[in-house]
C-alpha cells in the first residue's frame, strides 16, 4: 500500500511538472499581472482574510430569532483545525453579552468548601491546551429520515475542531472537596434559558476542562465567552456555554435537554438517555456534493474522520458503492477526539463512480452504513447519526448525493 501511495504522488507531481513547463511560455506576462499596482490595504488592529476567500457558515434559523444553528463549511477547510469564525454554532436561547469582570463560576452543592471564582481567578490556575472536536448531537440528524443533504456542509456541518485552553475541572473539584454520596455535576449556563446538563462525576474528574480560550484567543461570545465546560468526546450540548454554576448532587437533574431532547427514541418505544459519547464518523469532503471535477485524471480524495472514543485507527474508501475498499493515508499527528484528515490518490476515468469513507477508531468500532444503523435504532431519532455518506461522481464530473 505504501508503494501505491508513493506512485500516486509521483504521478500527480509529474502531471504538475508538465503543466508548469507549459506555463513557462507565459512567465513574463504572469509576473507583470501579479505585480500590485498600488500599496494595498493598510495595517489593521485585527487580521482579516483575503476578499477572494468566500467560505462562510450556512445558517438555519429556528422559529424564533434567538435560536438556530450555523454549519461549518467542511468542504472548504484545509488541515484539521476550524477557524473560530467558521466554528459551528447552536443556540437555544440567544447569545448573552457577559462582562468577564462581573462573571463568576460558583461550585456548590454537596461539597465541603463552596467556591465563587472570577474569570481572572481561573486564569491564574495551571492551564492546559487540548485539540478536540465539538459535534452537535443533532449533526446529520436529517439523514435518519432520508439522505437528502446536497453537500457536506448541510449534511455534516455541525462539527468543528479547535484548540481549547483552560483549567482542569478535576483541579477545582479537589479544591472544593466533593462530599460523600455526590455522583453528578449539574452544569448551568448564563444564557436566557439557563440551560443545564447533568454530568457524571467520573467524567468531571477525568478529562473535563473549564475553557476560556479557543485557537489562541479568548472564547468568542457564540462559543460561551467567558467560560465554557468542555467534555472531550461527548455531544456538543453537554459542553455548556457561558458556564456560571456547577452543583454537586447525588442524582441527575433530568433537564429538558437530556430527556425530551438529545435522547434517542428506539423502535420498541423506549428511549436511550444520557447517550453522551459521539461515535466514530467520517466524510469525504473532496470530491463531494456540489463540486465538479474538470475532467478525467488523477485526483486526491480527501476528508475528515473523528471519534469520541479516541484516535482514528483506519479510514477506508470505496469508489464502487461499497463493493471494495482501499485503506487511505492518515495525516499525522492523529489525536484523540480530534479531526484526522485522510487522503487517497484516485484516477477518475470519466465513468460514473460512487464514493464513500468508513472510519475505524482505536477501540475497534467501525462506522456503520445508514442501513446498519437503522436496523438497530430505527428512524424515530434525530440525534447521534454516524452513518456513511455516499457521493456520486457523474460522467461529466459533477458530484451529487448518491442517494437522492
Regions flagged by a language model, labelled:
Residues 15-25:
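Sec-dependent N-terminal signal peptides of Gram-negative exported proteins
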Amino acid at each position: 500500500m505504501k508503494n501505491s501511495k508513493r506512485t500516486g504522488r509521483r504521478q500527480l507531481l509529474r502531471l504538475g511538472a508538465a503543466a508548469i513547463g507549459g506555463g513557462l511560455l507565459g512567465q513574463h506576462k504572469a509576473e507583470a499581472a501579479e505585480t500590485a499596482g498600488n500599496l494595498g490595504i493598510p495595517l489593521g488592529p485585527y487580521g482579516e482574510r483575503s476578499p477572494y476567500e468566500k467560505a462562510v457558515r450556512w445558517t438555519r434559523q429556528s422559529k424564533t430569532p434567538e435560536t438556530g444553528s450555523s454549519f461549518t463549511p467542511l468542504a472548504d477547510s484545509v488541515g484539521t483545525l476550524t477557524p473560530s469564525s467558521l466554528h459551528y454554532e447552536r443556540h437555544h436561547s440567544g447569545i448573552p453579552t457577559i462582562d468577564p469582570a462581573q462573571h463568576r463560576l460558583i461550585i456548590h452543592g454537596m461539597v465541603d468548601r463552596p467556591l465563587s471564582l472570577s474569570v481572572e481567578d481561573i486564569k491564574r490556575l495551571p492551564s492546559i491546551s487540548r485539540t478536540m472536536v465539538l459535534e452537535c448531537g443533532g449533526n446529520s440528524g436529517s439523514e435518519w429520515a432520508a439522505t437528502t443533504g446536497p453537500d457536506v456542509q448541510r449534511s455534516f456541518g455541525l462539527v468543528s475542531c479547535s484548540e481549547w485552553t483552560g483549567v482542569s475541572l478535576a483541579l477545582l473539584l479537589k479544591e472544593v472537596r466533593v462530599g460523600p454520596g455526590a455522583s453528578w455535576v449539574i452544569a448551568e449556563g448564563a444564557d436566557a434559558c439557563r440551560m443545564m446538563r447533568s454530568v457524571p462525576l467520573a467524567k468531571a474528574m477525568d478529562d473535563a476542562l473549564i475553557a476560556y480560550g479557543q485557537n489562541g484567543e479568548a472564547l468568542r461570545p457564540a462559543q460561551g465567552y467567558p467560560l465554557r465546560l468542555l467534555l472531550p468526546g461527548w455531544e456538543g450540548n453537554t459542553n455548556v456555554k457561558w458556564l456560571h454554576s456547577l452543583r454537586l448532587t447525588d442524582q441527575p437533574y433530568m433537564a429538558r435537554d437530556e430527556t425530551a431532547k438529545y435522547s434517542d427514541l428506539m423502535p420498541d418505544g423506549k428511549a436511550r438517555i444520557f447517550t453522551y459519547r459521539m461515535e466514530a464518523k467520517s466524510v469525504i469532503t473532496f470530491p463531494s456534493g456540489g463540486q465538479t471535477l474538470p475532467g478525467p485524471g488523477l485526483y486526491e480524495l480527501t476528508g475528515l474522520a473523528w471519534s469520541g472514543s479516541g484516535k482514528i485507527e483506519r479510514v477506508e474508501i470505496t469508489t464502487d458503492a461499497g463493493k471494495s475498499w482501499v485503506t487511505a493515508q492518515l495525516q499525522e499527528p492523529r489525536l484523540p477526539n480530534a479531526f484526522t484528515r485522510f487522503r487517497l490518490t484516485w484516477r477518475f476515468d470519466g465513468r460514473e463512480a460512487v464514493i464513500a469513507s468508513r472510519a475505524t477508531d482505536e477501540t475497534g468500532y467501525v462506522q456503520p452504513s445508514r442501513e446498519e444503523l437503522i436496523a438497530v435504532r430505527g428512524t424515530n431519532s434525530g440525534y447521534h447519526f454516524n452513518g456513511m455518506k455516499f457521493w456520486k461522481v457523474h460522467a461529466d464530473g459533477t458530484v451529487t448525493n448518491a442517494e437522492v
